Amino acid sequence: SRLSRLSIATGVPFLVILAPGKGSYFREFLPKEYLEMKGQSENRMYEMWLDQLVLKGLRFLDLNSFFRLYTEVFPKNGIHWSEWAQVDAFNMISDTLLDILPDSLRPARLMIDSSYRSTIMEGTDDDIEQGLNLWRNIPDLEATYYNTHWEDVPAFKRPRILVIADSYAWGLVNKGLLREGYRDSEFWFYNQGVHGPNIVQKGASPQTVHGFSTKA
């Protein structure tokens, strides 16, 4: 493939991530009329991407299949994967990168100190609700959270990476991925907006970075 040839020519490895989608986990909440529409196929886009990645021999990590074995991957009132799932996803991505990076480089992992359950949502776990500008709170389901700290890996040993992704990456960026997990790295939001390692100081969310507000 063109991507593989570019990787070989530049000496820069790449990894494609297949993230889980909320519609695949909560199909019982999708409108019945939509599910019965002619030509509808469950997980069609995921299967299409997976087939092409395998066919072209591209290196990828299938987080969609991994997280299908777990519950509470998505919060009730959130768009994106749960806070705990983001931590597990980051560590899986970093572990996978270890196999393709030079031995002299390795990412820092998010070390899990403890976990707890709460009905008070944190991070992006209620970002649908926040974006709707509602006048009263929507009850949340109990969710799992981790207390974490970054593994102590010297900066010169951490690789620089380029993350090209949609808003699913914001949660990881919020946790310090660009500066603490890796070294002076960048996030290209939809391959349009370019954000560096200090973006977390701005609040690191599409709303704050691009001038949107959740306030009435």
Where would I find each of the regions flagged by the language model?
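Extracellular glycan-modifying ectodomains
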Residues: 1-216
